[in-house]
């Protein structure tokens, strides 16, 4: 498991460049030892520095998606059959995921992740789960909205196969999480309907001209 913590200062990233000061926290059982030949060895224990590379690769694209400055290249992090879900939408496939995030600048004057910390749980190279505990900012019709969320990314072969955004860190309502299964199914249908309408309005995930 690796932990990455960072704060995204205001006005430091754009559609073309990203500058983030990253801080990596090492577990306490990380130690250095010297063998008989006097050479230093790292006993990594549960910490493998290579595991941080997945967050290093993904986070710039995630920041672009939530920052309303995504390009078609930012969606290369998803597998072809990937899904995205938050309390408002349920997207299936990269085209629908594009529509979901391309719609942000249509709804908000400004949107971005202002602070985040990352934890990775890899069961094998490229396969596992990444948790992004974050704070998001939106400006809607002149009103400032600040929100905490937990972004859960599930990876297979280094690609995101499932992307969930838990607002207020609460599980998304569905037939499994709702106390009344019927209400959970109704919530699922509502999110799918919202996604379909957004997909049509965003011209079925068409990439914007640069």
Question: For the regions a protein language model found, what residue spans apply to each?
Answer:
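C-terminal and inter-domain tail/linker signature
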Residues: 2-210
């Amino acid at each position: 498991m690796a932990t990455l913590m960072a704060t995204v200062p205001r006005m430091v990233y754009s559609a073309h460049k990203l500058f983030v000061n990253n801080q990596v926290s090492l577990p306490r059982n990380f130690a250095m030892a010297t063998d008989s030949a006097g050479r230093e060895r790292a006993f990594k224990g549960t910490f493998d520095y290579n595991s941080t590379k997945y967050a290093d690769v993904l986070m710039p694209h995630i920041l672009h998606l939530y920052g309303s400055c995504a390009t078609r290249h930012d969606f290369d992090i998803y597998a072809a059959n990937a899904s995205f879900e938050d309390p408002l939408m349920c997207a299936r496939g990269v085209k629908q995921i594009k529509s979901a995030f391309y719609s942000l600048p249509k709804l908000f004057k400004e949107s971005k992740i202002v602070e985040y910390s990352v934890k990775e749980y890899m069961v094998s190279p490229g396969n596992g789960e990444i948790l992004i505990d974050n704070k998001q900012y939106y400006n809607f019709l002149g009103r400032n909205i600040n929100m905490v969320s937990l972004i859960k990314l599930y990876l297979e072969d280094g690609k995101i196969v499932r992307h969930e955004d838990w607002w207020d860190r609460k599980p998304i309502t569905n037939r499994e999480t709702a106390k009344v299964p019927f209400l959970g199914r109704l919530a699922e249908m509502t999110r799918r309907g919202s996604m379909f309408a957004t997909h049509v309005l965003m011209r079925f995930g068409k990439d914007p001209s640069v």
